[in-house]
């Protein structure tokens, strides 16, 4: 939304939820993966999104580079998927030991979630916005108001998203 706002396309916006990367592991966490650096251990098969494709891939690369693990993890990457949902498939088919994925996708999954500390992780505040050139500005604003309402945010929360603001992530 920042790019659209810089071009004057956003009439108004409000922060709503967080998009957060986490590590998905098999039930019971058989390799005892507890932190990002564990993904560089010998023999750990890692799945990530394609860094030139889906947002989860570019975010994972950015996070791993920032934490200093991007080069060290290369030999462990067994797949770079074209979609975020493929990461869940690779994990469920035991084609990878760990995947870097959005935490909300793990909410209704049999996989276990390993949180990445905020100082190493990727946390992004996701807003709702309306467009300056909307053909139906009143309806657009009504929808944005609903999304940002307690009821709208409750739907996001029900599906595994952390609601903004939270003590856990702050302003990210």
Regions inferred by a protein language model and the residue ranges of each:
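Exported/periplasmic ABC-transporter solute-binding proteins
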Residues: 1-172
